[in-house]
């Protein structure tokens, strides 16, 4: 959980993707629910985009656990961005607790197929990294609190002034 929080705050998409891919779908669901309950403005910024949409996936406008025509289980795999789609609803709709994590399914030529390997983890990571600084701090805290085995940690910034004050104090 510390690794996830650190990767969000520092904007390390690849490391965040790898860490998210190792996290259980159940834990991601708990995180998404916490986001939805406490920060609805962030809830509508994750998994509702089109950056993971591929031409062969058709024109999905909504999510479904086992995709059919115009449906997908790929985070940010919509044909067009839709801010009415919420992260907290995405995880429920695609049944992330026991399927579609870290790889989602897409609908191609009359059947649901596995999407991009670790595609859902990659999309969630990108969407989290794209948040503003304050939102990333909030997300880091929620990740630390909701991911199994997580513990709350405080990451402080150290300024040169405090280092100088401490150094001078130590000399006295």
Task: Pin down the residues of each PLM region.
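Long non-transmembrane domains of secretory-pathway and surface proteins
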Residues: 1-172
């Amino acid at each position: 959980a510390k690794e996830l929080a650190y990767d969000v705050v520092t904007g390390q998409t690849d490391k965040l993707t790898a860490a998210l891919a190792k996290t259980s779908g159940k834990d991601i669901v708990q995180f998404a629910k916490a986001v939805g309950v406490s920060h609805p403005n962030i809830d509508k910024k994750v998994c509702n985009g089109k950056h993971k949409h591929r031409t062969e996936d058709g024109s999905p406008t909504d999510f479904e656990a086992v995709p059919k025509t115009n449906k997908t289980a790929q985070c940010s795999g919509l044909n067009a961005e839709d801010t009415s789609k919420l992260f907290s609803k995405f995880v429920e709709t695609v049944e992330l607790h026991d399927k579609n994590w870290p790889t989602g399914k897409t609908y191609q030529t009359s059947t649901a197929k596995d999407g991009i390997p670790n595609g859902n983890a990659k999309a969630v990571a990108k969407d989290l990294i794209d948040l503003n600084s304050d939102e990333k701090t909030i997300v880091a805290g929620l990740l630390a609190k909701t991911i199994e085995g997580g513990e709350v940690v405080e990451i402080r910034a150290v300024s040169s002034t405090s280092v100088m004050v401490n150094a001078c104090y130590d000399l006295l």
